[in-house]
Amino acid sequence: MLSILSSLLSLLFLFIISCFFITSHFWFPLSLPKILGFIKITSSRDDYDNEQRDEGTYVVGVEELQRELMPRHVAVIMDGNRRWAKRAGLLTSQGHEAGAKRLIEFSELCFKLGIHTVSAFAFSTENWGRHKIEVKCLMSLIQHYLKSKIQYFQREETRVSVIGNLTKIPESLLRTVQEIEEATRSYKKKHLILAIDYSGRLDILRACKSIVKKSEKGLIREEDVDEALIERELLTNCTEFPSPDLLIRTSGEQRISNFFLWQLAYTELFFSPVLWPDFDKDKLLEALVSYQRRERRFGCRV
């Protein structure tokens, strides 16, 4: 009886509210289709929220994440700094500065959520083809970023590794890289990897050449060559988890751009339309929820 009474009161309330919103006059007679239409809109809000959640546009919270399903390694292609600066009427260098700041916030949140390794594509081998002024700015920014954050990473007990072809970067940057790697080498729980002058193809090529040289010296035999050996020769051998569980790319581009070609074989991909400097906490949580809803089969049927 109480249930029926409650339902009748709810319908009466919806009737009165619908009168107010549709006509702004309680005494104006309403057609039944209008009333039913309003009731339908009101009752479908939960369905709409669920649809938004499925589409990845619903704002999610940390409570929606499951600790046991958290990725161990998250890689990110930080795309969109220049476009962000252009839209804001700023210099390209200011866009890259905003991107560097976002990386600190991004990695910090990842570590707080229990993610062990964060790797960021900071500068690709192909980026040398950009304007010399922008390249110089990027090298200077990376050096300043690393130099100014040494104490921060020590305080946070975060290991920092820089991978790539470091023979072409400025001497001052190389010294800073060596300094921060040495200062944070002993930390185990959190690991930030920066890829500078990195190419996935060249990483594999370098690993193959190293194996050939070791074979010529009699250090390894043909039967020793397997996937595990190749992985030990790749530049990501610096981490306990060389293969990312999740790759995030921002700015709407949907390609991996020669990043971690071997390592991404079974990585889950998340492409966001948001430009990197705007990729905030809510967007990261959105990516992680999307990841946790997927069924990872690694090529096998379950």
Swiss-Prot record:
Annotated metabolic or biological route of this protein: Protein modification; protein glycosylation
Gene Ontology MF terms in the entry: rubber cis-polyprenylcistransferase activity
Obligatory cofactor(s): Mg(2+)
Enzyme Commission number(s) from the entry: 2.5.1.-
Keyword annotations from UniProtKB, A to Z: Transferase
Catalytic class of the enzyme: transferase
BP terms from Gene Ontology: protein glycosylation; response to cold
PROSITE patterns hit by this protein: UPP_SYNTHASE
One cellular component term from this protein's GO annotations in UniProt: endoplasmic reticulum
Superkingdom of the organism of origin: Eukaryota
HAMAP family with a match to the protein in the record: ISPT
Similarity field: Belongs to the UPP synthase family.
Function of the molecule: Catalyzes cis-prenyl chain elongation to produce the polyprenyl backbone of dolichol, a glycosyl carrier-lipid required for the biosynthesis of several classes of glycoprotein.
PANTHER family xref list: ALKYL TRANSFERASE-RELATED (PTHR10291:SF25), DEHYDRODOLICHYL DIPHOSPHATE SYNTHASE FAMILY MEMBER (PTHR10291)
Record-given protein name: Dehydrodolichyl diphosphate synthase 3
Taxonomic lineage from the root: Eukaryota, Viridiplantae, Streptophyta, Embryophyta, Tracheophyta
